[in-house]
Amino acid sequence: RQDSVANGLKEVRNSYVFIHDAARPYLKKESLADLKDALQHEDACLLMIPSIDTVKLVENGYVVRTPRRDDVFRAQTPQCFKTSLIRSCHEQAALDRRQATDDAQLVEWYSDVPVRVVTGDEANIKITIPADLK
């Protein structure tokens, strides 16, 4: 996935880019408008929804910490960036041979630019298993 995005970014000529997963077909136009609004003042933003489940951090099969639920969100796409910023982050990750779980993580690793949270939508699910289609 990361290589595909990096290759796509080579062709982008716009100042800002929206990076979206094809596995999330239920994106609402209101979410796109909210992201576009955020880009008026930010160079990086993404859709996120609060976690409704308790999350545990685990090492070697043992729970080491339980973050406060208020601090845990689930990332969605699209994730939006100033094109030069995300392109630079992808280039650095390729040089370092690091794989991120999403594009926003690259911005966390390779810049000081804050990533703005934009409230997502529960309907914007990622379809990964057959049960997701029900």
Which functions belong to the PLM regions below?
Residues 1-62, 76:
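Conserved beta-loop-beta/alpha segment of the NTase-like Rossmann-fold superfamily
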Residues 9-11, 38-39, 65-66, 98-99, ...:
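Solvent-exposed alpha-helices and their adjacent loops that cap or buttress functional pockets
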Residues 65-75:
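A recurrent flexible, glycine/aromatic-enriched loop bordering the glycosyltransferase active site
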Residues 73-134:
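Conserved alpha/beta core of the MobA/IspD/sugar-nucleotide pyrophosphorylase nucleotidyltransferase superfamily
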